[in-house]
């Protein structure tokens, strides 16, 4: 009855003495399975202790899978699982008939008399199932590596294998059950106490922007934040500013609290790492990007540039500019970075360039898979994830260009999965394209409006699951792609 041999060439080991191939046996413990099932049939309450981590597919024997599954179904209905109730459910099953099921169930009951701690048997069954899955993954990795198809690169195969192994390793960690309320209460009080000690009341990672921190209270672990805007609004520039500020602020906090330095991860699916770092250098050294690209720099500017370059090089700031990554690849690389570099916050530019895994022809379904995947990364790694997003062209057709939640591309699922949705909007961009002719009566009115929004970027917090929404005006220097706190100013109509 037991499946104790693998009849294929992939699982054959050589006997070193006789040089005779010996079929390898998959790891299993049929007796442990029998004794556990018998114990549960004797006392159904034992099921609650093992069902938190043990599923029917963890059993090696197909008949044991069916018996365990039947026990779960019977008890879910509020009935008692006994050999009699099981027999009525499985009587038409061919495998049950083949092994003379009634006698077999009686045998299980007899074997249960020797069980001392059934939970230990459940753990043995679970551990052996993990080992069998590990063998399956190993075979899959070998078979994929033998596949010489040019459609799948070796790098993709490695990431696929790494993801499979990580999922297998973390499977037991994700089997969460009810937690007594005292534990999360203690965690909440600890968080509140930390907030009370902070004069700025920022309990997450500071954005480096006072008014934005007052609205968001910093970036919080396990949150998914969406930063959306139309082209030329400054999405990437703003994300770079936030990433650099977060990197510096995490470092200071880690040093103060005597903790391991956390790092920033930045997936740049659109721009190359060179383009991204050129923007960083322009922002920090306050040298326009045209001068940097053309190399037209005086000695003073060049020295300033070298100084900022040296400072930036020391930061725990990591960029991955691989194009068209799948959500699975992003998850794998983020996990690796968390493990190797203590990832503290993750930025992704931008959401619509990520590929789904299921290859759905429905783009809304694919975006749903991606946003759910990003939220899962935030929760699993316990970090904030900030993903940039495009907005629908419908914005340009309205008189009022301020974005709304309904303007998100494939909006329903993005809005639903995000903890915070922010829009970046610069009225200056639109006004400069509506300048009346010089001498026109409306020119003075236009100039007055432009003065009031000059160098201002509005960050519109449209959704905030745990806080207020509203508008946060910031200073924006388009020459250096630099954001800062906005000083309160008065404007003259002259």
From Swiss-Prot:
Annotated GO CC locations: cytosol; primosome complex
Can you state which reaction this protein catalyses? Answer: Couples ATP hydrolysis with the unwinding of duplex DNA at the replication fork by translocating in the 5'-3' direction. This creates two antiparallel DNA single strands (ssDNA). The leading ssDNA polymer is the template for DNA polymerase III holoenzyme which synthesizes a continuous strand; ATP + H2O = ADP + phosphate + H(+)
The transmembrane segments are none
Q: Specify which residues bind ATP according to the UniProt entry for this protein.
A: 229-236
**Where does the source fall among the domains of life?**
Bacteria
Instruction: Report the top EC class in one word.
Output: isomerase
Report keywords, A-Z: ATP-binding, DNA replication, DNA-binding, Helicase, Hydrolase, Isomerase, Nucleotide-binding, Primosome
Fetch the Pfam families from UniProt.
Answer: DnaB, DnaB_C
Give the gene symbol: dnaB
An example of a GO molecular function for this protein is: ATP binding
Matching CDD domains:
DnaB_C
Q: Which residues form the SF4 helicase domain?
A: 198-490
Supply the name of the protein: Replicative DNA helicase DnaB
Q: Which family does it belong to?
A: Belongs to the helicase family. DnaB subfamily.
Q: How is the quaternary structure described?
A: Homohexamer.
- Provide the function of this protein: The main replicative DNA helicase, it participates in initiation and elongation during chromosome replication. Travels ahead of the DNA replisome, separating dsDNA into templates for DNA synthesis. A processive ATP-dependent 5'-3' DNA helicase it has DNA-dependent ATPase activity.
What processes in GO biological process is this protein linked to? DNA replication, synthesis of primer
For this protein, the Enzyme Commission number is: 5.6.2.3
């Amino acid at each position: 009855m037991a499946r104790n041999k693998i009849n294929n060439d992939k699982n054959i080991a050589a006997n070193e003495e006789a040089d005779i191939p010996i079929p390898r046996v998959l790891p299993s413990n049929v007796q442990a399975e029998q004794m556990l099932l018998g114990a549960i049939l004797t006392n159904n309450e034992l099921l609650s202790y093992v069902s938190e981590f043990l599923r029917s597919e963890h059993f090696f024997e197909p008949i044991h899978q069916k018996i365990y599954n039947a026990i779960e179904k019977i008890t879910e209905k509020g009935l008692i699982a006994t050999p009699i109730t099981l027999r009525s459910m499985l009587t038409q099953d061919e495998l049950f008939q083949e092994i003379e099921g009634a006698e077999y169930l009686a045998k299980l009951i007899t074997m249960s008399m020797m069980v001392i701690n059934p939970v230990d048997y459940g753990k043995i069954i679970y551990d052996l199932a993990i080992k069998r899955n590990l063998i399956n993954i190993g075979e899959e990795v070998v078979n994929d590596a033998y596949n010489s198809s040019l459609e799948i690169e070796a790098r993709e195969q490695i990431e696929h294998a790494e993801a499979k192994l990580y999922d297998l390793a973390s499977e037991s960690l994700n089997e969460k059950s009810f937690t007594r309320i005292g534990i999360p209460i203690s965690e909440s009080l600890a968080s509140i106490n930390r907030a009370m000690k902070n004069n700025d009341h920022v309990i997450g990672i500071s954005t480096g922007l006072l008014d934005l921190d007052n609205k968001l209270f910093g970036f919080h672990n396990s949150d998914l934040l969406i930063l959306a805007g139309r082209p030329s609004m400054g999405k990437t520039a703003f994300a770079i500013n936030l990433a650099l500020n977060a990197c510096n602020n995490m470092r200071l906090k880690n040093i103060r609290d005597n903790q391991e330095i956390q790092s920033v991860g930045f997936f740049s699916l659109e721009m190359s790492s060179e383009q991204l770092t050129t923007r960083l250098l322009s922002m920090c050294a306050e040298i326009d990007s045209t001068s940097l690209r053309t190399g037209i720099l005086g000695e003073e500017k060049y020295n300033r540039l070298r100084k900022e370059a040296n400072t930036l090089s020391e930061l725990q700031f990591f960029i991955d500019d691989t194009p068209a990554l799948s959500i699975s690849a992003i998850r794998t690389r983020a996990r690796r970075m968390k493990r190797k570099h203590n990832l503290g916050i993750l930025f992704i530019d931008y959401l619509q360039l990520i590929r789904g895994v299921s290859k759905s022809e429905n783009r809304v379904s694919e975006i749903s898979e991606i946003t759910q995947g990003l939220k899962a990364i935030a929760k699993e790694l316990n970090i904030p994830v900030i993903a940039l997003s495009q907005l629908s062209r419908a914005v340009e057709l309205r008189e009022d260009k301020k974005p709304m939640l309904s303007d998100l591309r494939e909006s329903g699922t993005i809005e639903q999965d995000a903890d915070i949705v922010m829009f970046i909007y610069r009225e200056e961009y639109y006004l400069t394209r509506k300048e009346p002719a010089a001498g026109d009566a409306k020119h003075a009115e236009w100039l007055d409006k432009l003065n009031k929004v000059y160098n201002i970027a509005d960050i519109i917090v449209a959704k905030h699951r745990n806080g207020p929404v509203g508008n946060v005006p910031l200073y924006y220097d388009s020459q250096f792609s630099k954001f800062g706190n906005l000083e309160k100013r008065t404007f003259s109509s002259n």
